[in-house]
């Protein structure tokens, strides 16, 4: 694993943000999203985040409950209106095959049957990738 940036469950450029999100940003549709949608997960929330187990659903409920509402609204606005076209010079991109929140077909490493919360639901696989990444960065910096 050679690279200087480790990107997990994300998009590298705005082109990887689904068109429907970019369109929603242009039309400012997210401004009409009720705050209850950001606080209390609905079936669509579970679907988008790819959580299927009872424990994962409980964890997502806790995360949403504990997340600052203003931060959530700010973050959604930033994602929907992001215009980055610059790729990092050197990176490793890790993505879940079942990530419906940010579906992506341009990663170098895919975690099978993993959704957007794969750092929690597939933590042993992600930890191994992080360990390998840190070892490669450390060994390349010594050369």
What are these regions (language model features)?
Residues 93-95, 99:
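Short beta-strand/loop motif that positions the catalytic acidic residue
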Residues 13, 100, 117:
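Active-site loop signature of alpha/beta-hydrolase-fold enzymes
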Residues 37-84:
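Conserved alpha/beta-hydrolase catalytic His-Asp/Glu region
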Residues 114-129:
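Catalytic histidine-centered segment of alpha/beta-hydrolase-like enzymes
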Residues 3-36:
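Flexible "cap/lid" loop of the alpha/beta hydrolase fold
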Residues 1, 16-17, 102-105:
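Short glycine-/acidic-enriched loop or helix-start segments at secondary-structure transitions
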Residues 87-91, 103-107:
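Short, proline-enriched alpha-helix->beta-strand connector loops that line the catalytic pocket
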Residues 129-140:
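C-terminal alpha-helix
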């Amino acid at each position: 694993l050679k690279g200087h940036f480790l990107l997990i469950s994300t998009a590298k450029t705005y082109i990887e943000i689904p068109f429907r999100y970019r369109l929603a940003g242009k039309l400012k549709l997210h401004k009409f999203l009720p705050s209850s949608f950001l606080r209390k997960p609905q079936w669509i929330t579970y679907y988008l985040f790819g959580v299927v187990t009872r424990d994962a659903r409980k964890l997502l409920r806790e995360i949403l409950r504990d997340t600052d509402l203003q931060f959530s609204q700010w973050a959604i606005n930033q994602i929907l209106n992001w215009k980055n076209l610059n790729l990092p010079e050197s990176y490793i991109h890790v993505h879940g095959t079942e990530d419906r929140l940010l579906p992506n077909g341009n990663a170098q490493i895919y975690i099978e049957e993993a959704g957007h919360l794969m750092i929690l639901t597939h933590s042993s696989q992600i930890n191994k990738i992080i360990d390998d990444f840190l070892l490669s960065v450390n060994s390349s910096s010594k050369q």
